[in-house]
Structure formats: C-alpha cells, structure tokens
C-alpha cells in the first residue's frame, strides 16, 4: 500500500443506467457526489419461473443504494449518473492507494453459484471463453448484465459476474434467462434491455 498520496480518477458515464465500478482507494460518499451520481452494492440474487413451465426464465440481481459512508477499496460497487454524458471526477488527497487485487463476492442460491469479481485488467472476450465458470457477464452500455461475446472486452476498474450450476442441480434455465441478468433496486422495478445493441461492454 502507498500511504499519503494524491489520487485522481476520471471516467465518462454516457447514460443514466447502472454500471460497475472498482477502485483501489476509498471514496467518501458525500452530498456533492450524490448530487450527480447514485451508488449501490449487491444484496442478493433471485431467479423465478414466471410462466410456471418448470424452467427458470428470469434471473435478477438485487442491489441496495448507498446514501452515506464510504466506498471501500478493492470492493465491487455500482454507479449510475443522474444525467447523460456525465464525467466522474474523483480527487482524493493524502489517501491510501491499496495494492490492487481481484475481490470476489460470492452470492449463491441452492442450485447456482454466482460470483461478482472486481478487476483492474482489460480482459478480452476470448479470455473469458477459456475460464472455468459456465457463463460470464458484464454490464452493457444499456444497463443489464449480458454474456460477454468473444469479440468484446471488459475495461479496467469494473466488475464481471460468473454463473455456474452446482453439480447435480435439477434446475432448468431458459436460454433467454441465461443470456441476460436484470438489475433490480431493492423495493423498485427491474432494469435491463431486450436485446444487445452494441457488443462493447463498459
């Protein structure tokens, strides 16, 4: 760790959908920051058979908004701009730059293992294809978790999601449910998109 350093982080947020953020330093959640952005953490994963055909056809990630406190270093969070084309500028003086590492948040159901992994690397879609989990997802520019195509990539300072069926699992999941995972704010409706409009994930 490097102690007593000045850090500046800048990132453009093109729309008002949720995206992931993963930083190696702590960020105070101030009123000024909340004037322009919303932050959240993952709380749970849910799946449902909405048409009663014996097959899971909807998977959701539940998140909870952060109203105060601190975003901890090396911990995956979610960020949403309150207006389009907003620039996130974080300036932290005399702070600690923590050693970068991948942090994994495990959020499993009875039959499925989910993992949210923070990354500082630029990971190509072809690299995900060779990893051990069943499926990998990143948040698209339109705000939902989508499977990462081989011709796309994950940018640094973000998180990805993996999903693996447990051995002996009787669960059947539809192709549509496996293709995308919605993000739902606790107590509110779902967010997501009907189809991929851009292979680039942010």
Segments (PLM) and residue ranges:
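Contiguous mid-protein beta-loop-alpha structural module that forms a pocket-lining wall or clamp
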Residues: 37-41, 57, 77
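Acidic, divalent-cation-chelating loop motifs in proteins
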Residues: 49
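A short, polar beta-strand/turn micro-motif
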Residues: 1-35, 64-135, 139-144, 149-196
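Acidic carboxylate motifs that coordinate Ca2+ or other divalent cations, activating on Asp/Glu
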Residues: 53
């Amino acid at each position: 760790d490097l102690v007593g350093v000045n850090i500046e982080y800048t990132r453009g947020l093109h729309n008002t959908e949720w995206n992931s953020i993963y930083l190696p330093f702590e960020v105070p959640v101030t009123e000024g920051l909340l004037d322009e952005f919303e932050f959240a953490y993952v709380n749970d994963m849910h799946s449902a058979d909405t048409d009663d055909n014996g097959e899971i056809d909807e998977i959701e990630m539940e998140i909870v908004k952060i109203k105060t406190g601190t975003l901890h270093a090396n911990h995956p969070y979610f960020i949403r701009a309150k207006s389009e084309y907003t620039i996130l500028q974080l300036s932290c003086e005399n702070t600690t730059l923590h050693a970068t590492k991948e942090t994994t948040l495990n959020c499993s159901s009875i039959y499925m293992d989910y993992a949210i992994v923070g990354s500082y690397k630029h990971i190509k879609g072809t690299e995900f294809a060779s990893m051990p989990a069943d499926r990998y997802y990143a948040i698209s520019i339109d705000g939902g978790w989508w499977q990462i195509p081989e011709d796309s990539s994950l940018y640094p300072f973000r998180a990805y999601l993996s999903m693996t069926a447990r051995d002996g699992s009787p669960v059947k999941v539809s192709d549509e449910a496996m293709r995308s995972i919605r993000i739902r704010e606790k107590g509110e409706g779902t967010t997501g998109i009907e189809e991929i409009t851009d292979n680039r994930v942010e």
